[in-house]
Amino acid sequence: MNKHDPIVGRYVYITCQGKTYRTYYEENGEGIPMVCLHTAGSDGRQYRHQLCDPDISANFRTIVFDVPRHGKSLPPAGWHLEEDEYKLTTSFYAEFIVEFCRALELHKPVIMGQSMGGNICLELALRYENEFSALIALEACDHSPGWWIDPLHHPEIHGGEAVATAVFGLMSPESPDEYRWETWWYYAQGGPGIFKGDLYYYSVDSDYRDKVHKISGKVPIYFLTGEYDFACTPEMTMRTAEKVKNSECIIFGGGHFPTSEDPDKFKEVITPVLKKILQNDPGRRGSATENWSSNRSSSGGGRPSDDAPRRRVIDL
């Protein structure tokens, strides 16, 4: 019999800021809901390995949606009549995430996002701390300047290939070629101007340098950044984490797209974090918990009683 992945895909209609979006999402697993956010210009396929991971799915209901205009989520009706170029804004992005979670009736989900999906975790902590139980910010920091540039959407440049090749260097040279080129392929398929429009949020509309100290610490935030990432360097992440209450900063040997460029290494890094989340919320773990028992050792142990940021470097 042919192999099937356990992933199930559906569409849900989300209304946000006066428009309705037919939004595609995939999910698998049971337990604590965990909504995953893809990077700028890509889509939810970046999380296909985590969606299929039996250890994760035994304890987490992992859900990945395509942001409108990405992947299988179409632009809103009438998009071709829009006079202004597409720009993802902080307000829309944050509100859409919240509306998506409410549409699926998720109770205090975990949010895990990378790149722009990681940066938005800071906004969610500032504005919607009561909506979430934990935030996992991959390749994230309080400001990522310099990426909103015109060549990313230019009539004389092949957008897909230019965008995909531009981000290729953000991956670790140690990541398997198979997965690096798979990540390249995702980017080559983006809609015209979408990557640049996402980077408006990433580089222009998401400057949290004077805001992160206001995060209360009510929701734990886990920062994880690869040492080969030069869009969000380890130093940028560590500087941010130092200002965020109840945070932990983990630096590991990876690149800007950890979930897709090297899923095996990412699993080694994310497993202790997910175990901590389970330990802090045991009532919502899934039914099959043999592999991730809270009695088994995990790197770092439990969260300290104080809310000071912590830093760990994992040499993988």
Name these PLM-found stretches.
Residues 2-22:
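N-terminal cap/lid segment of alpha/beta-hydrolase-fold proteins
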Residues 17-18, 63-112, 268:
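Active-site loop/oxyanion-hole signature of alpha/beta-hydrolase fold enzymes
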Residues 146, 159-217:
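Conserved alpha/beta-hydrolase catalytic His-Asp/Glu region
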